[in-house]
């Protein structure tokens, strides 16, 4: 029995865990307090690895970022950045239009205050930026972690290849630890679902359904509206034939593999069939799998604003714009690790003074809905890589 269960995919295990958790909560509610330990251990493990994960992934991503391989690379990068920002903005609008409420254990966290004026927010950001790096990691100050990771990453871009390889190896090592933690996700989610449904009842299903609807709806909006607008402006023509071809041949594969990296060969093959210059595609598509993560920006923004709404924190437009930028930067570090976008949510939550403990509960909620969220996110991310690469190549051929 155990051998059969071990052979199942993580998605299947999580689905089974959710069903069992709901069943136990409804049939044996008196047992659920004893199951809370599983959820607490899972959240504690996530809370422990998240700071070093954010630091190493962003540092390695920036240190190994190379520009100048192709004349067409700069406009592709511009599309990547603009696309992620617009995806984050779309997530803000969707979250404001359809606010979601999460079931969180907020006992002893009722002293949270709304951010003050824009000047206060910027002041707090600057103070967080210059925090001691060791202290930032130990206290889970994700803004400080992000600042040091970006600064050191930029400084190390001109270091030797050996140093960069060491950073990549460290990143892979941290990712390996994350994979071990994520492997226990079904057990943790079982405990979390059982306790949550026992405490909140079937109303929890409605909450998760709305959250999923906002997430998936925003990603579809990005794929079918935002991306076509950007591509249409680039190629100066009807973008939808190219958009649908990329979604069909790249997005569907990525949906089931749930890995942008694993989908790189699919994208390279599609780019070749679309007649894209190999010197451009060979760089921009692997690079896109690392830094072009519009779906991750949507996930980080939606879940953060759902947390803000749940805690009753009022935020103004300026703060939301800052959140969109932070979500975009954080998304660049989410590649290559299971649940990467979810594990970078604390970076965005720290903007609003939300504790790491609550942020990790939000990550756990994200894990519960990740069966659909992660697949759709990967489909958007990976199909966008080849879409923008092909669009820029078409534009360059038009100009030649």
From Swiss-Prot:
Q: Which GO terms describe its biological process?
A: serine transport; threonine transport
Task: State whether keyword Cell inner membrane applies.
Answer: yes
The keyword Transmembrane helix appears for this protein: yes
Can you name the source organism? Acinetobacter baumannii (strain SDF)
Q: Which domain of life is it from?
A: Bacteria
Family matches, as NCBIfam families:
PRK13628.1 (NF010151)
Where is this chain's protein located in or outside the cell? Answer: Cell inner membrane
| TM stretches of this protein | 14-34, 48-68, 76-96, 136-156, 177-197, 211-231, 293-313, 334-354
Catalytically driven reaction(s) = L-serine(in) + Na(+)(in) = L-serine(out) + Na(+)(out); L-threonine(in) + Na(+)(in) = L-threonine(out) + Na(+)(out)
How does the UniProt record describe the way this protein sits in the membrane? Multi-pass membrane protein
SS bond partners: none
Q: What does this protein do?
A: Involved in the import of serine and threonine into the cell, with the concomitant import of sodium (symport system).
List the molecular function annotations (GO) for this entry: amino acid transmembrane transporter activity; symporter activity
Identify the keywords attached in UniProt to this record, alphabetized: Amino-acid transport, Cell inner membrane, Cell membrane, Membrane, Symport, Transmembrane, Transmembrane helix, Transport
Q: What is this protein called?
A: Serine/threonine transporter SstT
Taking the record's annotation, the residue ranges forming a coiled coil are none
Which family is this sequence assigned to?
Belongs to the dicarboxylate/amino acid:cation symporter (DAACS) (TC 2.A.23) family.
Tell me, what's a Pfam family for it? SDF
